[in-house]
Amino acid sequence: MKQLTLAKTVKGVGIGLHKGEPIEITLEPLEANSGIVFFRSDLNASYKASPENVINTQMATVLGDDRGFISTIEHLMSAINAYGIDNVRIVLNANEAPVMDGSSISFCMMLDEAGVKELDAPKKIMVIKKPIEVRDGNKFVRLTPTKEPRINYTIKFDNAVIGEQSYNFEFSKKNYIENIARARTFGFLKDVQALRSMNLALGGSLENTIVVDENRILNPEGLRFKDEFVRHKILDAIGDLTLLGYRVFGDYTSYAGSHHLNHLLTKEVLKDKDAYEIVSLEKTTQKAYEKVFA
C-alpha cells in the first residue's frame, strides 16, 4: 500500500464552536512523508499534528506555541484518519477548526470531494507491541496489541438521558462513515452559561451540538443514534490518536476517557520505544493490516 494525499484542493466555511465566528478551511495535498500540517493563514504559522505540539486538552485538543494556537482539531483529524490520508495541509484563517454540524461528516464530504492520490512511498502504520495504559482514578485509556484493531469505549454520566453507554468499533472506512462520522458533540444546558462567561462555546447551538438537560434532549430532531454520545467519544478518540502520526494498529479501550487522557496516552506510547513498531505496508502482505483501510 502507498501513502495517500488529496487529489485536489478543497475549500469550506463553517462556524467556530468556541468563538462563534465564520472560519474558512482549505485542505491541500502534500508530498510523501509530510504528515498532517495545520497552517494559520492569519499568523503565517504552521503546526505539525503531533503530541509534542499539543498545548491544551481542556475542552478540545489544541495545537500551538508562543505564536498562537489552533483548537478543536479532533473531528477533522478523525475523518482524515478514517480516509487513510497520510499527508495533508489544513489552512485556517482563525484559531479553531469549524465545528460544522458537530460531527465529522462534513469533513468526510470534503475528503470525498477532494479524492485521494497515491504517492510514491509506502504507507506506514504504528503496531502496538505491549500494553500502555493511563489512569485517573477509575477513568482510563489503554492500548494493547491485537490482530484486528478495535475501539471499545464506555462512558458513564450522572444524567438520566446519557447514563452508561458502551460501543465496540471495528476499524474500516465504511464502518466509520456508517456508524461514527455522524455522531455529534454534546454538552449540558447547565454548563452553557459558565462556558460562555469564559468566552467558550459562543458558536454552540442546536445546529451543531446535542444539548442535554436533566431528563431530556433539547434538539427537536432528537438523536441520530440511540447511543450517539459514546459514538462521538469514539470519533474524538480516533482524532486524538491520529496525532501519533500513523494509523494505530492496536486495541484501544476507554472507560470515561477524555482528550486529556488520550493526550497522555500518546505521550506514553512515544516515550517507550519498545511499545510500538513502525511497519511499512510495502513490506508485508498481512491482510489484517490492509483491512483497516477498506
From Swiss-Prot:
Binding site residues for Zn(2+): H75, H232, D236
Lineage: superkingdom: Bacteria
Short name of one Pfam family: LpxC
UniProt cofactor(s): Zn(2+)
Enzymatic reactions: a UDP-3-O-[(3R)-3-hydroxyacyl]-N-acetyl-alpha-D-glucosamine + H2O = a UDP-3-O-[(3R)-3-hydroxyacyl]-alpha-D-glucosamine + acetate
UniProt xrefs under InterPro entries: Ribosomal_Su5_D2-typ_SF, UDP-acyl_GlcNac_deAcase, UDP-acyl_GlcNac_deAcase_C, UDP-acyl_N-AcGlcN_deAcase_N
Record's protein name: UDP-3-O-acyl-N-acetylglucosamine deacetylase
Gene coding for it: lpxC
